[in-house]
Regions:
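Short, surface-exposed acidic-centric catalytic microdomains
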Residues: 25-61
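Phosphate-binding/catalytic loops
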Residues: 89-98, 104-176
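Single conserved hydrophobic/aromatic residue that forms the stacking wall/gate
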Residues: 1-11
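Conserved beta-loop-beta/alpha segment of the NTase-like Rossmann-fold superfamily
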Residues: 62-109
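Accessory terminal and edge-of-domain segments that mediate assembly/interaction
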Residues: 8, 18-21
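Short, conserved active-site loop motifs that form the nucleotide-linked donor/cofactor pocket
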Residues: 7, 45-46, 76
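Hydrophobic/aromatic beta-strand patches that form the interior of the parallel beta-sheet core
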Residues: 49, 77-79, 116-121
Length: 176
């Protein structure tokens, strides 16, 4: 349930989607057949979906969205939390492993590794034995502030992605 996944980005994602939709004067709709909340950024021609399924069942949403759009999975971007990035860092890459992320593991099992990902850092506790508890804890006020700033960068990156392409978006996100 969302209450138990406090550190994971799923709760913040809903806030981010609502903010992006609001700033673009778009309405968030639920598409239950896709297991997702959805809106279209008209000026950018970008569709954003927020999965309503459990993280471990992420492929359900991903597969239905790909099928719904009659499109190739290479045109889709998965946004996920990443404990291997410091909090608030955002990276864009294509391919790679799951890094222990169960949602990615689930998508990779069904679709392979060849898709783009926006990786949003949530930090690491410093000891692998503490990871499970770490991803279930709430963010501190300072961490929330850092993530709010990351949201602004993420939102700007969508503009760059739509107008200037993937390479420029990667340059924007992957350099600090």
């Amino acid at each position: 349930t969302p209450i138990r996944r406090q550190r994971q980005m799923c709760i913040r994602d809903r806030d981010w989607i609502a903010k992006i939709a609001s700033s673009s004067k778009s309405k968030v709709s639920t598409k239950s057949s896709l297991y997702a909340d959805y809106f279209f950024l008209n000026k950018l021609s970008i569709h954003l979906y927020m999965s309503n399924s459990y993280v471990n069942d992420s492929y359900k949403t991903f597969s239905r969205i790909v099928k719904y759009h009659k499109n190739d999975k290479s045109k889709f971007f998965v946004v996920h939390d990443d404990i291997d990035l410091s909090i608030g860092k955002i990276r864009l890459k294509c391919g790679g492993g799951h890094g222990g992320h169960n949602g990615l593991r689930n998508i990779i099992q069904h679709f392979g590794e060849d898709f783009y990902r926006f990786r949003i850092g949530i930090g690491h506790p410093g000891n692998k034995d503490l990871v499970t508890d770490w991803v279930l804890t709430k963010f501190s006020p300072s961490e929330k502030n850092t993530l709010d700033n990351a949201f602004i960068k993420f939102h700007n990156s969508l503009d760059i992605l739509a107008k200037d392409g993937i390479e420029n978006c990667q340059k924007f996100l992957n350099t600090d």
